[in-house]
């Protein structure tokens, strides 16, 4: 009590001695003056808060049963004025009574109206001040989230009532804290809010336009992306953002305007994808983005001190994100560029990535590479990520420098992968860390076929990390329903089977893509490093993983491409490790059945309009660009495996596959069987005949003679019937 000023002590004593609400209210005018004075410290405010008693302040805020000598608004105004001062102290702003008053404060701001007379607007302003102070501390933030403050504030801003900027700043403060969980599953409030801000940004020609860019970026990045994308029909805010950002890119602007615009563009591309850049069905905006991103990267990374470059981390990360989206889209060959545009684009990108490479090389040799500062670490991740995106497309340039830098890039990528694994194994708070290794996989596909790069990869035991990554992403793609506690099983028996959430489905899609890239790299390793594939413990573990997990994979259209990749990877590994395979190994038996199913189901005549034409099956047709080469490689590798593991031929016979091939080809019209398909089937059947004495009789019974004649299968004919 000694540090409480004397006037404050006297006032507190007076308040405690009051015998009626009227007396207490009269004393409050003295409190108002005191708490706003410079002499009233935190201890003094706490003493006054306790002397008044929160129930009395709340009564002034909400009760209609008050003395008639003042209008209710005056009571409310005095109470809020005092509360605002109290809330400036953390101990009081986080006090249970004040936290419990949040719904009352929200109600006051929700009822605001531009038409309200001035006194009411002062009340609303004070209520916002209280909410802002409460939102500055963790207990208040949690309470605001729980009471639905974000959708309510969104509604206030969308309706454009009084002091809506206060509502907007509260929203930004909260969404920055809570991220995705800020928003309910119903995206209505989110769409309404973004539409209002986007329209304001599009039509505003003052500096506020750029402030709104920053606010839009901060809010957009926290959305429930899958839900928002699936509910975009009828929404016009993507178009407002497109027009607003387009106007900014055309204007003469400085860094103060350009930086928030780039921030918003990068975030919008992250949420809506690259198609947003083609909303007017022209390529101008896309090319402007690419040029601006590349120029900014060159300027910010050009021969500066590393500390200076790292200070621009946020801006550069946005530019990297824009360039990654542009590069990924250009790789799809959907962009029709004139020769001059191609040259300009390539020159811009090459200039930018020469700087990126130079900076990353300096980072790899500087003490900053060991920095424990999360922002520095995140920026290094971002540099490796964007360079990896470029190297996935640029497969020849800068090779000596890249090989030299590759160990550092792998170290960074592997570290980010371990961070993601740890995050998923824990409570999963906040945004998931970005797996730079996953982004690097397409570039590693190229490195896997380059001898020098492959040497670096094996020296740094990257094959072990890639197997770990395959196991990790398979666990995500192979979604299993959460286990039900034993005590609840009976009452939940009739519940429908749970399905993955939209967020989980998005994760599964990313995981499947990673598995395909990982299989590609590991296949190249297996073929190009046969000795390691035969003797290396990592490759033994890899085969074990494939044969145990492929049969478990759900038979769904989404899984077909990873099924094919794992099946063929397994065959390549079986071929190299054939000496170690034990006859009738149960897991190998199950694996080979799953592999036969993949190879068998690719072609048929049942689904053809012409009953004499062999066609790719409907299930495979939509994915055939990804499966065609795999299927031929699978058939070819099966031919290589059979002489080494002859007992596998039993499965081709017992399953009816060998007989099925002959019966199908028998119905195919002469001269219509594609040469590569004919070779694949003929080589396979010939190998079966060579390794298994029972095959001849089965094929002859199925009328293999006619098939050999019709489709000119000379080699198979000789094996079955002699010359």
Curated annotation (Swiss-Prot):
A Pfam family this chain is assigned to: Neurochondrin
Native organism taxonomy: Eukaryota, Metazoa, Ecdysozoa, Arthropoda, Hexapoda
Tissue: Expressed in both somatic and visceral musculature.
Gene coding for it: Neurochondrin
Native organism: Drosophila melanogaster (Fruit fly)
PANTHER family in the record: NEUROCHONDRIN (PTHR13109:SF7)
SUPFAM superfamilies named among the record's database cross-references: ARM repeat
Protein name: Neurochondrin homolog
A GO cellular-component term linked to this record: dendrite
UniProt cross-references to InterPro entries, sorted A to Z: ARM-like, ARM-type_fold, Neurochondrin
Protein function: Strongly up-regulated in Mhc mutants suggesting a role in muscle function.
Family listed: Belongs to the neurochondrin family.
GO biological process, one term: regulation of neuronal synaptic plasticity
